[in-house]
């Protein structure tokens, strides 16, 4: 009986070593991006990868773009706490900020505030082409073809 238990323990040890080898053979690669690498703040509220492969980062003090090598900060938004990012089209991002909802043109680096009551925009979700749900502290909004409409939930 002791011999069988010893054999089972040896087999179990070999199985566990084999499983550990499988997991250790594919290490996870990651980057740690901080103010040292160019972020204006280490407080990151939103991350979005666009269709071009850029990673957009919404921080406590503005918007940044990471291309895999370097961080670019957009100073036009340096005073805005960005909570949410969605891609509207190949040129435009939709940004949820503490001062409302804004369009950001990637070609011109210009922001335009969308006409909704001033409220902190906490989340934006794309539900179809040119259709978004926007969660604010003042309620929920539905945007269709750039036209916002408040949704009242009962």
Which residues fall in each region the model found?
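Carboxylate-rich, polar loop motifs that coordinate divalent cations or form catalytic acidic clusters
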Residues: 1-154
């Amino acid at each position: 009986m002791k011999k069988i238990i010893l054999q089972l323990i040896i087999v179990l040890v070999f199985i566990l070593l084999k499983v550990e080898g499988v997991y250790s053979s594919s290490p996870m690669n990651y980057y740690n991006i901080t103010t040292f690498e160019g972020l204006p703040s280490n407080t990151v509220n939103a991350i979005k990868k666009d269709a071009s492969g850029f990673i957009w980062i919404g921080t406590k003090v503005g918007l940044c773009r990471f291309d895999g090598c370097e961080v670019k900060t957009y100073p036009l938004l340096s005073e805005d706490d960005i909570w949410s990012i969605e891609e509207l089209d190949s040129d435009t991002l939709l940004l949820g900020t503490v001062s409302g909802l804004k369009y950001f043109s990637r070609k011109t680096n210009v922001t335009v505030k969308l006409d909704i009551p001033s409220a902190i925009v906490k989340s934006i979700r794309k539900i179809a082409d040119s259709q978004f749900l926007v969660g604010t502290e003042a309620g929920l909004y539905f945007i269709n073809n750039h036209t916002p409409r408040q949704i009242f939930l009962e």
